[in-house]
């Protein structure tokens, strides 16, 4: 399966990198590398994440360190919708693509 990243995820990743990079740019790079690696696992094992009915009936999440990768399984693609810190008010975030 192919991985498709939403525009919102790109913004989430930029925000995440900038937040960590204030203290250590190399650590920010490594953190994002781990997020990309974990997201790549979805191509091989799309069902690995747990269902998130409080977000949407077809949305799942996969834990990566302190963040959650929210995604939806389509016929031939995995749509990554958001990457959010686990302490956020998750049900009240926007998960839909524009």
Question: Positions of the model-derived regions?
Answer:
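Enriched for short, Lys/Arg-rich terminal
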Residues: 67, 72-98
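Basic/aromatic recognition patch in beta-strand/loop cores that engages polyanionic ligands
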Residues: 47-77
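Basic, Lys/Arg-enriched alpha-helical interface segments
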Residues: 2-59
